[in-house]
Every structure is written in C-alpha cells, then in structure tokens.
Amino acid sequence: VGKRVASDVVNMYDGAASCVSAASYFFDDDGVEAGKTNIIKNGILQTGISDCLSAMELGTAPTGNGRRESYKRKVYTRMTNTFFDAGNDSVEDMIKSIKHGYYLCQSNNGMEDPKNWQIQCTAGYGIEIVDGKLTDHIVAPVVISGSVVDLLNSISMVSKDVHIFGMGMCGKGHKEWVFVSDGGPYLKGKAKLS
C-alpha cells in the first residue's frame, strides 16, 4: 500500500455499490454495507479488498467484500464490480497511436497467480492494427498473459468510454461461485498475446 504498481493514468475500483450489475448488493455476507473501494489511484496502490476476518487480521476496516456462494459455505474476500476508471482518451486516438498491435474484443475470462503476480485473460478475438488503422486481419481466440505489475505499468492511454457488463461468475477452483462484473474503458498497454 502506498507504492507505485501502475502508470499514472491507471485508476481502479471495486465495490458492490460502484455500479448497478448482477454483482451489486447493499450488504455483504458479513453484514457490512457495500461500498466503492479505490484500489489504485494515479498508479499508486491505495488498499485491497477485505471481508471482516481478513480486515481484523490486517487491522483495517472491512470493505464490504465478504461473499459466499450460499449459506452452506464460508465467507471469503471476493471481488464484485472490479474495473478501471475512465481516462481522457478517445478510442480513435488510441488506435491512431499504435504502429502495430491488436484491438481486443469480448473479454471473457481470466485468472491470476497471486503468489507470483502473474495473470492470464482471454478475449474472443482481436483485430490487427497497422500504422494506426484497423485491418481486415482477425485472430481468435486471444490469450493475454504476463506480470500484473508489468502490464499495469505499460498502460499509456485509457479511453473516456466505460462499459460494465454484469453477468460473470468467479470461482475458487471448482466451487464457491459468485456473481461478478467486468468491463471498463479501453486500455492501451503491452502484453504477451498468443
């Protein structure tokens, strides 16, 4: 907390009260009022998310992220509506600024390795960009992988437009499924694609 984990243009939030979606609620499963947590502000890590137990162990206030699949399950700290905040760039200007890259569409899943700070996400397809213009070359599916900190620090542009889609699910292995939302603005960054 208090350290740089991303470029200056990165602002990230989580919270059941941050937008209206399938992952929104008034109180978490610990009875804590839902809120909007500013995780990263101008590239600096502000805080994490927590349930009551983890907040007590860390000596912090709970963030309203105590969630469980059903009454039969234990409460864990879980994401809700996690997204990047809007930036100042138009998607058109972002595309024009790219010599060679891909415009990725239809993000559909992801997973992280919290011990090694690695991430892997997939997109339904990507449209190749050459000399600032979209081409007719489409690749599908696209896997995005790499170090979370490297990816966050590579973000140089963030679009003004933000779109949140609220019908995702997040699980812990093969169990503990809860509703989550994804989306956000378009980001210009560098990552390994395959």
Locate the predicted segments by residue.
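N-terminal small-residue-enriched
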Residues: 1-194
